């Protein structure tokens, strides 16, 4: 799916079971498509810290991200602070990373281009 259209324009689909867990080769293909994100927890999650000028900007980002998570039915773990938000994606149902994590990471990155 992500090979045909940009990740930020793709949609999440339900993924359950270890057969949907991405292997190292696929992770290496997808990671360059989401600059600023890094593999964490031994390659089991994606994370990125987004920095903002103040709490209002941080919360605007978090609220917009909540809408994306709701629409895609794929929810991140968040650490929310005055001037930053730490975003972590992983697919618990596959025991690691799935394409849904990369799709949502790309959509999350795109938010920073749209918010003040």
Curated annotation (Swiss-Prot):
UniProt protein name: Putative pterin-4-alpha-carbinolamine dehydratase
GO BP of this protein: tetrahydrobiopterin biosynthetic process
PANTHER family: PTERIN-4-ALPHA-CARBINOLAMINE DEHYDRATASE (PTHR12599:SF0)
Reactions catalysed, as given in the entry: (4aS,6R)-4a-hydroxy-L-erythro-5,6,7,8-tetrahydrobiopterin = (6R)-L-erythro-6,7-dihydrobiopterin + H2O
Gene3D superfamilies: Transcriptional coactivator/pterin dehydratase
GO MF entry, a single one: 4-alpha-hydroxytetrahydrobiopterin dehydratase activity
Disulfide bond positions: none
Keywords: Lyase
Family: Belongs to the pterin-4-alpha-carbinolamine dehydratase family.
Top-level EC class as recorded in UniProt: lyase
EC number(s) per entry: 4.2.1.96
Pfam families recorded: Pterin_4a (PF01329)
Entry-linked InterPro entries: PCD_sf, Pterin_deHydtase
Entry's transmembrane regions: none
């Amino acid at each position: 799916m992500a090979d045909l259209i940009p990740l930020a324009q793709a949609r999440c689909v339900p993924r359950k079971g270890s057969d949907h867990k991405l292997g190292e080769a696929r992770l290496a293909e997808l990671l360059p498509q989401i600059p600023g994100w890094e593999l964490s927890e031994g390659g089991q999650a994606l994370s990125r810290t987004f920095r903002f000028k103040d709490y209002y900007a941080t919360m605007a980002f978090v609220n917009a991200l909540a809408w994306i998570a709701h629409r895609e039915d794929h929810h991140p773990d968040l650490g929310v602070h005055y001037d930053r938000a730490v975003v972590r994606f992983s697919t618990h149902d596959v025991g690691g990373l799935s394409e849904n994590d990369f799709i949502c990471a790309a959509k999350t990155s795109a938010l920073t281009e749209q918010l003040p």
